[in-house]
Amino acid sequence: MMAMSEAQRADPDVLIVGAGPGGLASAMLLAHSGLDVLVVEKCAEVGGRTKIIEQDGFRFDRGPTFFHYPEIIEEIFQAIGLDAHKELGLIPLDPSYKLV
């Protein structure tokens, strides 16, 4: 995250508690609209339930391994002038499942 001035830390326009996907998306949109946003997170890393835990050479997803609605992520990034696929490295699963 970007470093902020002491004034921004002391008096942000918006305080967001939690740096999971929802908190980060909200922060992106609000900051893009010109507000000073401060995100606070209790953990050392951002990501919330989308973090990965590594233990004994194995990787475990703490949250989703795929998003059912990637278009929502794409809309959020488009709203701030970025491409979600370039920024996040999203990989389409085609098909991820079939309804029969």
Regions found by a protein language model. Give the residues of each.
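Gly/Ser/Thr-rich beta-alpha loop segments that engage phosphate groups in nucleotides
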Residues: 20-25, 49-50, 59, 65
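A short, basic/flexible loop-to-alpha-helix module at the beginning of a structural domain
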Residues: 1-12
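N-terminal FAD cofactor-binding segment of flavoenzymes
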Residues: 53-54, 60-96
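N-terminal Rossmann-like FAD-binding beta1-loop-alpha1 element of flavoenzymes
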Residues: 12-39
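Glycine-rich FAD pyrophosphate-binding loop
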Residues: 31-56
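A secondary-structure boundary/capping signal
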Residues: 17-20, 42, 63, 69
